[in-house]
């Protein structure tokens, strides 16, 4: 199933809020539509957010041409898209790449600039697919035959340009013939695990079991989990990692039970400008995502709601970070810095 495609000057994205029971597409004709797709979680996952934002810049520059606006309008478009979601660093990384292309080409004709922006967006997309495969290959070396793997949220093809980061590792292990089983946290409140990860695994024939988030510790105590693999939305220089809310709790449980805890992410998810997780902004989303379930109110009006979308897992709880350039072990600050030099 194609989950996004740019064709006929439109970006068409699969509405992931409707999966797995409805297959509905959202058409982005303008950069404002792209903002909505990111902000409202029609699409999600740090790498995919970056790709979609890049195509948003393309749509924005198309509008500049059609309305005969000054090319400098692109800076407003870049800032607008940057405000869609604050935590995933791939968003800012992709927008910075698009900005650089524009600034190097700004003396060319608008049509030439448009072509170069389109080429860069496609390049970001194509690179991500290749990067995911490499992440999977490196991560597969950590997966033992017969491993029971726990994952959280969705870090699969639906969250990336294709194949996935955490699920890329799982796919590589499965396709290599390893007899693995995946436990999938449902991942409240958006249920990305139950709706998306279980869907992807089932489509590939990978054995999986969906569990409620609060069951993970019990499974670990029973000896049913051999490792935990999750994705990431932003990684600090010291290895602290922001990922879907609930990841921190899993890391604490895994550390207590002596279970390896792996982060799987492209180098573009590393923010080399921040030293620790304390500098990562944590997005808070609408109370209604918790107040309502399947369109029905389940929380009393008198009760307050706290709905952070992410938490930060400290580096000391992380066994290794799997990237396209290899597996990074502690000391993270030293070894992450080396990645930039490679």
UniProtKB/Swiss-Prot annotation:
Site (Transition state stabilizer) found at: 153
Give GO BP annotations, semicolon-separated.
L-methionine salvage from methylthioadenosine
| Catalytic residues in the record | 233 (proton donor)
Write out the residues that bind substrate: 44-46, 85, 192, 243-244
Catalysed reaction(s) here are: 5-(methylsulfanyl)-alpha-D-ribose 1-phosphate = 5-(methylsulfanyl)-D-ribulose 1-phosphate
Decide whether keyword Membrane is in the record.
no
One of the entry's Gene Ontology molecular-function terms is:
S-methyl-5-thioribose-1-phosphate isomerase activity
List UniProt keywords, sorted A-Z.
Amino-acid biosynthesis, Isomerase, Methionine biosynthesis
Q: What EC numbers are recorded for this enzyme? A: 5.3.1.23
Q: In which pathway does it act?
A: Amino-acid biosynthesis; L-methionine biosynthesis via salvage pathway; L-methionine from S-methyl-5-thio-alpha-D-ribose 1-phosphate: step 1/6
Q: EC class of this enzyme?
A: isomerase
Does this entry carry the keyword Amino-acid biosynthesis? yes
Q: What job does this protein perform?
A: Catalyzes the interconversion of methylthioribose-1-phosphate (MTR-1-P) into methylthioribulose-1-phosphate (MTRu-1-P).
Q: Which PANTHER family match?
A: METHYLTHIORIBOSE-1-PHOSPHATE ISOMERASE (PTHR43475:SF1)
HAMAP family noted in UniProt: Salvage_MtnA
Q: Which family does it belong to?
A: Belongs to the eIF-2B alpha/beta/delta subunits family. MtnA subfamily.
**What's this protein's name?**
Methylthioribose-1-phosphate isomerase
Biological source species: Caldicellulosiruptor saccharolyticus (strain ATCC 43494 / DSM 8903 / Tp8T 6331)
Give the source lineage, highest ranks first: Bacteria, Bacillati, Bacillota, Bacillota incertae sedis, Caldicellulosiruptorales
Gene symbol? mtnA
């Amino acid at each position: 199933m194609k989950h996004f495609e740019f064709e006929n000057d439109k970006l068409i994205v699969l509405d992931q809020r409707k999966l797995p029971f409805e297959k509905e597409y959202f058409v982005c004709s303008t950069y404002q539509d792209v903002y909505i797709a990111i902000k409202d979680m029609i699409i999600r996952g740090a790498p995919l957010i970056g790709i979609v934002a890049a195509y948003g810049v393309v749509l924005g520059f198309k509008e500049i041409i059609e309305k005969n606006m000054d090319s400098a309008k692109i800076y407003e478009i870049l800032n607008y898209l940057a405000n869609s979601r604050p935590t995933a660093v791939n968003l800012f990384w992709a927008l910075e790449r698009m900005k650089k292309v524009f600034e190097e080409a700004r003396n060319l004709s608008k049509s030439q600039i448009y072509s170069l922006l389109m080429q860069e967006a496609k390049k970001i997309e194509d690179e991500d697919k290749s990067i995911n495969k490499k992440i999977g290959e490196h991560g597969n070396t950590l997966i033992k035959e017969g491993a029971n793997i726990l994952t959280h949220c969705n870090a699969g093809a639906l969250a990336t340009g294709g194949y996935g980061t955490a699920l890329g590792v799982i796919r590589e292990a499965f396709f290599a013939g390893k007899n693995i089983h995946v436990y999938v946290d449902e991942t409240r409140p958006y249920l990305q695990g139950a709706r998306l990860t279980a869907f992807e695994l089932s489509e590939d024939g990978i054995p999986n079991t969906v569990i409620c988030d609060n069951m993970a510790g019990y499974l670990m105590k029973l000896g049913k989990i051999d490792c935990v693999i999750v994705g990431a939305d932003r990684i600090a220089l010291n290895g602290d990692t922001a990922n879907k809310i609930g990841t921190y709790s899993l890391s604490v449980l895994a550390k207590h039970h002596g279970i390896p805890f792996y982060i799987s992410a492209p180098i573009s998810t590393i923010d080399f400008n921040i030293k620790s997780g304390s500098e990562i902004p944590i997005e808070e989303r609408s109370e209604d995502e918790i107040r309502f379930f399947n369109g029905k109110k389940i929380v009393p009006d008198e009760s307050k709601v706290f709905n952070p979308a992410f938490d930060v897992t400290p580096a000391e709880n992380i066994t290794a970070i799997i990237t396209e350039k290899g597996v990074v072990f502690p000391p993270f600050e030293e070894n992450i810095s080396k990645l930039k030099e490679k």
